[in-house]
Amino acid sequence: MRPSGRTAQQLRPLTFTRHYTKYAEGAVLVEFGETRVLCTATVEEGVPRFLKGQNKGWITAEYSMLPRSTHQRHARESVKGKQGGRTLEIQRLIARALRAAVDLTKLGEFTIKLDCDVLQADGGTRTAAITGACVALQDALQKMRVEGKLKSNPMKGLVAAVSVGVVGGESICDLEYIEDAIAETDMNVVMIEEGAGRKIIEIQGTAEGAPFSHQQLLELLALADDGIKTIFQAQKKVLEK
């Protein structure tokens, strides 16, 4: 039995609050159980130097955790004077995931910056950030269309992510912190919805306590696929409002 009483494949309660702040073109508070991440999308004219003159857009991301988003306070990275390796890894993952879902040639020479700020961390912050950033990005793109900056929606499909892992020899989906801390295997899976199916954008998997078998890998991917299918349904529902 999991600490929350969930079954192996069961997600934590998932909610999206759109337009959470009023200034950004897209602003979404995403909540996976007790994990809460504020995701905003900002549209700026112009692109990085390496894309100038190509009539292509760009998507980038930044990720941070508030000092008391965790059990013990940690100093802001801005005070330390540099970003940590974990932060850089996560924000690059977020950016890669969302770029894979957008036809940058249809974006024009605009840059969309996704800011993902963890308000409270209870496991799965990077997967929550990707999932929430996708909804914020959709809102920003819709606003660009309304303002006449885009002729069509460049989004190829929804993007979502979920954590899976092996805890006590059992494969489970959507790990909370207490599970993640003792997991023998920890994996993050990012997918895009294409038609009625789903395709993998990225997999990050590590044997934390013990190596995992090929069979366990297949079990984890199946759990992730099923969980992300449910997340896509939740994204669609909130975007219809």
From Swiss-Prot:
GO molecular function ontology, one term from the record: 3'-5'-RNA exonuclease activity
Gene3D superfamilies associated with the record: GHMP Kinase, N-terminal domain
InterPro entries, per database record: ExoRNase_PH_dom1 (IPR001247), ExoRNase_PH_dom2 (IPR015847), ExoRNase_PH_dom2_sf (IPR036345), PNPase/RNase_PH_dom_sf (IPR027408), Ribosomal_Su5_D2-typ_SF (IPR020568), RNase_PH (IPR050080), RNase_PH_bac-type (IPR002381), RNase_PH_CS (IPR018336)
Pfam families the UniProt entry points to: RNase_PH, RNase_PH_C
Positions with a binding annotation for phosphate: R86, G124, T125, R126
E.C. number: 2.7.7.56
Enzyme class: transferase
Keyword GTP-binding: no
HAMAP family: RNase_PH
Family of the protein in this entry: Belongs to the RNase PH family.
Name of this chain's protein: Ribonuclease PH
Organism field: Hamiltonella defensa subsp. Acyrthosiphon pisum (strain 5AT)
Organism phylogeny: Bacteria, Pseudomonadati, Pseudomonadota, Gammaproteobacteria, Enterobacterales
